[in-house]
Amino acid sequence: MRYGEVSAVDKQALDLYLEKLSNVQVQSLNPTEQFAYWINFYNALTVKAVLDHYPVKSIREISLGGSLLPSFITGGTGPWQAKLIEVGGEAVALDDIEHRILRPLFKDNRIHYAVNCASIGCPTLLPAPFTAASLQAMLDRSARLYVNHPRGVRADAGGLTVSSIYKWYQEDFGGNWQGVLAHLRRYANPATTQMLAPFSTIHADTYDWQLNDAASASNTMQEPGRG
């Protein structure tokens, strides 16, 4: 993202888009449309939260209400529990969308590749919105992009290191490291498949909370934590 290059006109367009989404009669949508709708809503709200507080070095600097995730993960801050907008007369937070709607209702671990938390360690924010027609293809594309990038998984002399997403949400990936490995192999390209072949478990996990800002000079991963 190039947050510093977003114009006032662009911000107004984003506000109008969010207003349009907030006025949608969600119950009138079929399940596939709802799935795409909530992904787009989450990502647009995240971008707005960053733009409203930019410049910041990390989304964790935006102290609006923390997160459902433990404070040792998020630093106890962030915008995730703040009620940022109303949908159908009900105030909604980012955590509501991810943990009370998307994950429990759709039960698809590819959600973790679709929702973007504005950090270098998170999956890529695709340039186009999700639609009912494109949903499955875009979810698969997002999964492959992440699994086949060092942000998702990498190997070195110490063993196999994966994104902390697979630790935080391990229950969504089979409930153990073997389930995570099976998931990774499902979306791995030939090179990643070969890299994964020697491993039967995961050595460490890592996550980079730096803002996914193209203006940032650093794009390095943080030191891994033990898995």
Spans of features found by a protein language model:
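Interaction/scaffold regions that mediate signaling and macromolecular assembly across diverse proteins
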Residues: 1-227
